[in-house]
């Protein structure tokens, strides 16, 4: 049985866990959640808090949503939720630089009409700042620290360590939430039949390497549905 089928059963029998107030309160007040976005949040929260659903494995979640349906808003809300759950370091990576820049606008630019968080983020009575970082070596655990990268740059940084860039040690020493948009691009280089050397040079190998470096890390992938052709 697929995970979504298990969650559908839970929804019918016991009901899904509700979205906590702090999550809604710390999103931009112009945002009105759509029904399917509420479902997405409740599905994740129920899954995250149900040991039987992930069988004590590292949490690795795929959100399969249509282009323009508000995937980035879901990411923003889950960043808040996971921060409250003890995660302060987030790696956002995607295949194209322009998507990285658009997401920075959504997450970092308070003056933008597309900014997704509240003007002031307050969790458990504390003001929480969102900071863009180049790596996770000296991050403040009281902040939400986000490192933005392309999949290609992430792979290069891990393969050719440089000063102030991400290294595998960042991921061994800290719990990191990995967030990938348009994640179907991540595994385009790894195919059946490739030899081990080619696989170790792939982007997918690098992503899996950082994910498994610390058992406490979490992975959230977002995948767009293809356009409907009529």
Where is each model-derived feature located?
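RecA-like P-loop NTPase motor core of helicase/translocase proteins
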Residues: 1-230
